[in-house]
Amino acid sequence: IHKGVTVEEYVRAAERLRGTGIRLSVTLISGLGGQKMLEEHAVASAKLITTMKPDYLGFLTLLLEPGAPMLQEVKSGTMQLLTPAQVLEEMELFLTHVDSEGTVFRSNHASNYISLAGNLNRDIPAMLEKIQKSRERDAFKNESMRRL
């Protein structure tokens, strides 16, 4: 994914917003790096959030609609979408690497396989436990329910 913005530019933008008193809300998309980048995406995202320390953080899970440019990468095999278990693995890696005390965390969008809610860092253990239980039981939202 080429976002057209560097990590440093994200951090500077967050600092400028904070300087004006605007609350910072950030959205991350799980699965954006595909299977090859799962660990790197999770850890780099956690590092960015640790640096930015947003007021709010939302986690979505990648959904590709017909016609999406990334769909060609999936069809050609250059990118493999994450399985539900891998999405939870990525979220687990993120939560074990992030340090953003007080950030309101939500992963309750229709695209997500499970819903999580809490405040970082206080509620990370409970969210990790919910992820582990969901993985053990294969308790994921049905694909057909992941659409709005």
Range-by-range predicted roles:
Residues 47-148:
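Auxiliary Fe-S-binding modules of radical SAM enzymes
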Residues 28-31, 61:
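Short glycine/proline-centered loop/turn elements that form peptide/ligand docking sites
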